[in-house]
């Protein structure tokens, strides 16, 4: 017997037209999308289906869009009955809904609030992220310390032994 798990993506997997095919072909998907639009008080589906891309890239829209798409897909294939659900960053919220740990309606509002807070944090504290691939963690830490002489540079996340985000 094989075991199954649902894995959900974080921010960055958004694209114009996401979930449009599901909306057009699935009553369940259409209902979930309409519920999300109502819960958020914004026409998120229009932004997802039509853009503009610059608006979809704004964290306050990106995060609920990716969450919504992920949860719809999980719902449509729920008969696979996964033993586990996990997600990267934003994907953790989709995993919680998939595991029935939180209700969809509550989660979509929570994800929107998260996206807004993160967008505001980026405005208040401008910066950028970069993934460093193939260097030893200690070397990246040393380079960050040296670079901090001219600005703030620090390790933000150790994604894997071969990938560190600064």
Protein language model regions, located:
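Helix-rich "cap/lid" substructures immediately adjacent to catalytic or cofactor-binding pockets
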Residues: 2-86, 166
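Alpha/beta catalytic cores of group-transfer enzymes, especially the acyltransferase/condensing modules
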Residues: 11-13, 40, 99-165
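Hydrophobic side chains within alpha-helical segments
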Residues: 17, 66, 72-73, 95-97, ...
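Generic anion/oxyanion-binding catalytic loop in active/binding sites
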Residues: 18, 59, 96, 129, ...
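General structural signal for alpha-helix termini and helix-helix connectors
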Residues: 21-24, 96, 120
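A broad detector of short, well-ordered amphipathic alpha-helices
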Residues: 34-35, 68-72, 92, 105, ...
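Conserved alpha/beta-hydrolase "nucleophile elbow" surrounding the catalytic nucleophile
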Residues: 87-88, 158
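Glycine-rich nucleophile elbow surrounding the catalytic serine of serine-hydrolase chemistry
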Residues: 88-97, 101
